[in-house]
């Protein structure tokens, strides 16, 4: 009996996959919806009776899982890079002109979908996991939710290992329909798609019409020579690729490429989905490897971002905001205006110099844009209805302390300023720092305004059950807040050091400190008590300059900062982080390096990432201050320049031991 059920399940899965391909890839469905649904229900029934036969590639998983998703962070197996971008066609043409195609012109052009970036991992042809791009090194695990998108094959029909990039999006039509029923509407379809994808219950996600385009291989278990062949393979495997992708070869001209870009730009508003630009890629994979990568982006691809669409609005008021560093930033409150797919009600004015340069004041009519289709900005005054220009107050709007000008910006220097305090707490809880879930800016502001907390330390001593009498705070939410606070105590010392807010101390500098045996509070504290010795010691670390060295020394001689560390120590925080680095790897710490050529079995981003993890500092170009150049096969002009500058040359064999 069980063998018959197992066979029927296998037959149903095969048939449903066939219908999925006909409907979503070929656009030629052979059965009506009710027939499809009937077979899905039968498969669900059988899998419920015999759960041992339910596999990860089952089509029933596309309708949601009974399990709840916790969106844990998972490390990407390869760095997930961004794209370089330009905003005008002259710069785009210049980028194309610089590429040495060796009389074999090959470029692909496709719309840049304005959605949520996703990375799909297939193991032996089965979808193993799906991660958001995150910060490029770590992404959120949204596998259960991605499985609900019927355009994502759970099984490829081939036992291959693939890492693919795609964009999850929602159509303009569905965006408008869904937004009507939401208590808090989203400003654009990208945010809605991202919000849906991050819903905790995958059963809810299955009810939303998410779409996906797959557009790139990050690490393929298949051998391709060109992007053309790779895209065709994606189609055959059942993935949805953008039908507007076009390939230009040696028979084409740059003019034809630019004409196609102009055509896409002209028609962008007629597409069923939002786009914010066009992406150009070199099609030849061998040439891609020769062109290489920077730490941020591949050199073989370029995004042409559309000029920000603009609108006109009236400045109703100008408010002054205070950041965690005390920096004063003026912001214009304007009449609501719809620009590039989003409503804008405020826009940064940067600083006093910028306001003066455009002669802006309250009451003026201004041109507003979203730079890069993201950042709201006041570009210029269109109609001047005021007298003179707005002047940033000479006192902090929060604590009334006289502000001090440093460079182009004004700063509040009061360490007890309420605005500075609340912004520091927000920074402490933010994703890049302690990543304390549930503590949104709104929640933190509420706690601060009610005088429940005045610093980040209060988060660990406050009785959150006092919030039960306030609207929006129930047992479940409060328990989640408490659990998040407790979980943060287990974060590594590097996160605490970053979160505590030492001026200009970032992740890279912290890594350099740790790799030089300054990996605990006690070591840093002892060092900094002798200011002169500490200054000389820190300057010996390649990558640390005078300014950041002084900031570190000042911080570890500041009684307020020291007391914070002591309190965190008493709360059970880790005050030391082990760094496993042998004598051989110490040779790389602080060394500046660059790479050229290709490396057998390793992509350039992986080489860079592994050397950086050993303490080396990646540079994009060869200069006199470079410590060594890593040379692979088919090295480019960087090798010649390095030889002229007497920069040390290291082969792939020289560094291979560092990569394992």
From Swiss-Prot:
Encoding gene per record: ligA
Protein's job: DNA ligase that catalyzes the formation of phosphodiester linkages between 5'-phosphoryl and 3'-hydroxyl groups in double-stranded DNA using NAD as a coenzyme and as the energy source for the reaction. It is essential for DNA replication and repair of damaged DNA.
Family: Belongs to the NAD-dependent DNA ligase family. LigA subfamily.
Record GO biological process: DNA repair; DNA replication
UniProt source species: Borreliella afzelii (strain PKo) (Borrelia afzelii)
Catalytic activity: NAD(+) + (deoxyribonucleotide)n-3'-hydroxyl + 5'-phospho-(deoxyribonucleotide)m = (deoxyribonucleotide)n+m + AMP + beta-nicotinamide D-nucleotide
Pfam families in the cross-refs: BRCT (PF00533), DNA_ligase_aden (PF01653), DNA_ligase_OB (PF03120)
Active site per the UniProt annotation: 112 (n6-amp-lysine intermediate)
Domain of life: Bacteria
Domain BRCT, residue spans: 583-660
PROSITE patterns: BRCT
Cofactor(s) demanded: Mg(2+); Mn(2+)
The enzyme's E.C. designation: 6.5.1.2
UniProt-recorded Gene Ontology molecular function terms: DNA binding; DNA ligase (NAD+) activity; metal ion binding
Top-level class of the enzyme under EC nomenclature: ligase
Name under which the protein is recorded: DNA ligase
Amino-acid positions noted as binding Zn(2+) in the UniProt annotation, renumbered to this chain: 396, 399, 412, 417
Metal-binding is among the record's keywords: yes
Residues reported in the UniProt entry to bind NAD(+): 33-37, 82-83, 110, 133, 167, 281, 305
Keywords assigned by UniProt, alphabetized: DNA damage, DNA repair, DNA replication, Ligase, Magnesium, Manganese, Metal-binding, NAD, Zinc
């Amino acid at each position: 009996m069980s063998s018959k059920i197992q066979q029927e399940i296998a037959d149903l899965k095969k048939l449903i996959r066939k219908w999925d391909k006909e409907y979503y890839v070929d656009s030629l469905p052979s059965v009506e919806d009710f027939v499809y649904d009937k077979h899905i229900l039968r498969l669900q029934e059988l899998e419920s009776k015999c759960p041992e036969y339910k596999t990860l590639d089952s089509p029933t998983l596309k309708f949601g899982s009974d399990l709840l998703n916790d969106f844990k962070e998972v490390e990407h197996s390869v760095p997930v890079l961004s794209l370089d971008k330009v905003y005008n066609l002259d710069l785009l043409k210049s980028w194309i002109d610089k590429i040495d195609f060796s009389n074999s012109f090959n470029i692909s052009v496709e719309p840049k979908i304005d959605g949520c970036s996703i990375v799909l991992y297939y193991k032996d042809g089965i979808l193993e996991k799906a991660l958001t791009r995150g910060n490029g090194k770590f992404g959120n695990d949204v596998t259960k939710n991605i499985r609900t998108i019927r355009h994502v094959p759970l099984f490829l029909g081939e036992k291959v290992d693939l890492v693919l990039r795609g964009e999850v999006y929602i159509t303009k039509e569905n965006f408008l329909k869904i937004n009507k029923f939401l208590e808090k509407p989203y400003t654009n379809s990208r945010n809605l798609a991202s919000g849906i994808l991050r819903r905790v219950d995958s059963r809810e996600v299955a009810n939303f019409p998410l779409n996906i385009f797959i557009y790139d291989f990050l690490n393929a278990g298949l051998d391709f020579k060109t992007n053309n062949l790779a895209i065709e393979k994606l189609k055959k495997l059942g993935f949805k690729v953008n039908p507007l992708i076009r390939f230009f070869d040696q028979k084409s001209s740059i003019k034809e490429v630019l004409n196609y870009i102009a055509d896409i730009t002209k028609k962008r508003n007629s597409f069923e989905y939002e786009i914010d630009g066009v992406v150009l890629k070199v099609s030849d994979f061998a040439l891609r490897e020769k062109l290489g990568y920077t730490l941020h982006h591949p050199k073989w691809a370029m995004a042409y971002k559309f000029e920000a669409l603009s609108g006109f609005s009236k400045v109703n008021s100008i408010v002054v905001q205070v950041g965690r560093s005390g920096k004063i930033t003026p912001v214009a409150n304007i009449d609501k205006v719809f620009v590039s797919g989003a409503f804008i009600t405020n826009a940064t004015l940067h600083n006093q110099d910028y306001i003066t340069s455009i002669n802006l004041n309250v009451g003026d009519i201004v041109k507003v844009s979203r730079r890069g289709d993201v950042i709201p900005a006041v570009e210029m005054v269109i109609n001047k209805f005021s007298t003179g220009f707005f002047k940033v107050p000479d006192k902090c709007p929060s604590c009334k302390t006289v502000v001090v000008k440093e460079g182009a910006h004004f700063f509040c220097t009061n360490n007890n300023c309420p605005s500075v305090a609340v912004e520091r707490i927000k920074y402490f809880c933010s994703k890049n720092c302690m990543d304390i879930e549930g503590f949104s800016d709104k929640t933190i502001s509420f706690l601060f305004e009610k005088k429940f907390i005045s610093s980040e330390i209060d988060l660990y001593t406050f009785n959150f059950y006092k919030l039960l009498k306030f609207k929006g705070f129930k047992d479940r939410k409060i328990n989640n807040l408490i659990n998040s606070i407790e979980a943060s105590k287990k974060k590594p010392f590097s996160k605490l050091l970053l979160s505590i807010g030492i001026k200009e101390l970032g992740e890279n500098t912290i890594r350099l400190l740790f790799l030089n045996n300054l990996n605990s509070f006690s070591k840093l504290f002892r060092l900094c008590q002798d200011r002169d010795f500490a200054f000389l010691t820190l300057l010996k670390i390649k990558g640390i300059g005078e300014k950041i060295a002084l900031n570190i020394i000042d911080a570890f001689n500041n009684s307020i900062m020291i007391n914070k560390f002591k309190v965190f120590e008493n709360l059970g925080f880790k005050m030391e982080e082990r760094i496993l680095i042998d004598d051989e790897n110490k040779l790389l710490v602080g060394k500046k390096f660059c790479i050229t050529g290709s490396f057998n079995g390793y992509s350039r981003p992986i080489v860079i990432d592994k050397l950086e993890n050993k303490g080396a500092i990646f540079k994009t170009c060869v200069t006199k201050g470079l410590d060594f150049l890593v040379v692979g096969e088919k090295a480019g002009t960087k090798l010649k320049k390095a030889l002229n500058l007497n920069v040390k040359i290291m082969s792939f064999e020289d560094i291979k031991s560092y990569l394992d």
